[in-house]
C-alpha cells in the first residue's frame, strides 16, 4: 500500500485480500477535529527547492491580515523528499496541506467534496483547489465556529462543527482521505473477512471470485459451492445455481456497508444481483450483528430463485420473442425509462438476445428465464460496466414477472419497435 490517490490492488485469493485490508486498517486512523481549529495551507507556488503555501486559519480570519507564507523544503532528506510522487500529487492535484495541532497532513484530491459538506457549500467550484476556495472554506469554518461559541447556532448545526477525519499513515507521512460528520463511525475493512468467515460456517466452503481495493472503495465477491450442491440436490434444475455474496464498503464515505446476494448460472462468469442489505457508517455495530442482518435480508434469494425457476419449468411459452421483449420492457429496458439502459443499447440488447431464439422451437418459462439471465454475460466488458451493473439487477427482477401476461402474438404496451417480430 502507498498513500497516492491512484493506489489500488485486485485479485481472486481470499488470503491476499485479507492481508491487503489488514494492512489498510493498520494504517488507518479516525480523529475528531474542530473545523475552526484547522489550518489550511494552500499551495501557491513551487519549484525544485520549495513548495510555498499561504496559511488560512482562525487567527488570519479574525485579524483580516494577509496570510502567512510557509514553505516545504525539497532539498534536505525528509519523509516528504523520500516520496516525490506524493509531493508532485500535492503540487499538481490536491494543492492543500492541513495542520491540526502539531500534526501536518497531506490531503487527497477527493477531499474537496467533504470540505464543501463541512462548510455547507456546494457547486462545481468546490472541486477546484484554489487559494480563493481555501480562504472561503476557512472563513465558513470560522463563522460557524464563532456562532457555536456564542450559542447562536442550533444544537444540530453546532454538532456539524466537529468532523471525524479519516487519515492513513505510511513512512512517516499522514494523509487525509475523508472528513465526515461527527456521527460517523469508522468500521475496519477487515470486518469483511470476519463476516465472510461467519458465512463460511453457515453455507460451507468459500470460493473467492474476485476482489478490488483502493483508498475509496472495497469490493469482494465470494461464492459457496457446497450450497450450490445442496440447491441442485433439492430442486433438480437443469442448470447449476451457484449462490454468493457481494460485499462493498468504504471508510471514506463513498459507499455504505453493503452486501448483495448473488447467483451465477452454471459456468457463466457474470452474476445476477438479488436482495441486498445496506447500513450507513453510524452507531456501534459488531460482526455478529452485521451477519445476522444480512441473513435476514438476503437469505430469501437462495430459496426464492430456485423455487421460481422450478415453477417456470411448467409454463409453456407460445411466443418466445414477444415474451422476452414484453418482460424486459416491463422490467425497465426502455429507451425512455430512467431505470432503462437507453435507446441504442436497448435495441442492441434485444436484437442480440432474440437472435438466440428460434420461433420454431418449443420454449418453457424456464428457457426464457435462462435467456434473460444471460444478458449481463453477453455484454460484459470494462467499458460497459455500468450497463452490466444495471442489467444484473434488472434481469434478476424480470424473472419474477408473470410470463404468460406477455405471451401474446401482438406487441405489448403500444408496440415494441426495437426489433422485428
Regions found by a protein language model. Give the residues of each.
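Feature for intrinsically disordered/low-complexity regulatory segments and propeptides
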Residues: 1-193
